[in-house]
């Protein structure tokens, strides 16, 4: 397990270094860097699945520490995934603004019944208002993604905590009644998390409907 863990840990640090390259990359190379980072993140998630299996096969006196190390790696890579998505969202928003600005400047607006040109200032003001609405919706969607990512991270943390509690309970020889109570609480937490995710989606939908 240790060699695979060290490789994965090293790869996480390499991705953190690559994230800094995104801010300085030009338009031609930024997509290449993004794809490289995403491919590395996907590979780490695959390795984490293998590490989880290996950690469960560790001796009882090493199992808890092994799972803690795997959980920490999982937490780090999930934050890297969120950071990459946030960067891509900001980049897409900038590119969309640039395209709309270029289209607006290259387009001549005329009325239907005369050759009177619509004042450019009014057109720019209208476009600016639309852009603010789009940016507000994009920010709302991004916040929703971050909330859902946080809920997924919380679920993984609760799942890992449940495993640790059950392992400790087995070592201490707790009764079946106590074990069932622990499992019941974990089951209830799962439904609370799902309810929170659904509520977030409903709120996002209602706000988007209101803005549009």
UniProtKB/Swiss-Prot annotation:
Coiled coil regions, renumbered to chain: 61-107
Cytoplasmic side: 1-190
Assembly description: Part of a unique SNARE complex composed of the Golgi SNAREs GOSR1, STX5 and YKT6. Interacts (via IxM motif) with SEC24C and SEC24D; mediates GOSR2 packaging into COPII-coated vesicles. Interacts with BET1.
Residues annotated as transmembrane: 191-211
Location of this chain's protein in the cell: Golgi apparatus, cis-Golgi network membrane; Golgi apparatus membrane; Endoplasmic reticulum membrane
GO MF terms, alphabetically ordered: SNAP receptor activity; SNARE binding
Stretches of the chain found on the membrane's Vesicular side: 212
N-acetylmethionine found at: 1
Any Gene Ontology biological process: protein transport
InterPro entries: GOSR2/Membrin/Bos1, SNARE, v-SNARE_N_sf
Keywords: Acetylation, Coiled coil, Congenital muscular dystrophy, Disease variant, Endoplasmic reticulum, Epilepsy, Golgi apparatus, Membrane, Neurodegeneration, Protein transport, Transmembrane, Transmembrane helix, Transport
GO annotations of cellular component type: cytosol; endoplasmic reticulum membrane; endoplasmic reticulum-Golgi intermediate compartment membrane; ER to Golgi transport vesicle membrane; Golgi apparatus; Golgi membrane; late endosome membrane; membrane
Cross-referenced SUPFAM superfamilies: SNARE fusion complex, t-snare proteins
Annotated protein name in UniProt: Golgi SNAP receptor complex member 2
Membrane topology annotation: Single-pass type IV membrane protein
Taxonomic lineage: Eukaryota, Metazoa, Chordata, Craniata, Vertebrata
Connected disease: Epilepsy, progressive myoclonic 6: A form of progressive myoclonic epilepsy, a clinically and genetically heterogeneous group of disorders defined by the combination of action and reflex myoclonus, other types of epileptic seizures, and progressive neurodegeneration and neurocognitive impairment. EPM6 is an autosomal recessive form characterized by onset of ataxia in the first years of life, followed by action myoclonus and seizures later in childhood, and loss of independent ambulation in the second decade. Muscular dystrophy, congenital, with or without seizures: An autosomal recessive muscular dystrophy characterized by hypotonia and elevated serum creatine kinase levels apparent from birth. Patients have progressive muscle weakness, areflexia, and may develop seizures in early childhood or have abnormal epileptiform findings on electroencephalogram studies.
Motif annotated as IxM motif, chain positions: 118-120
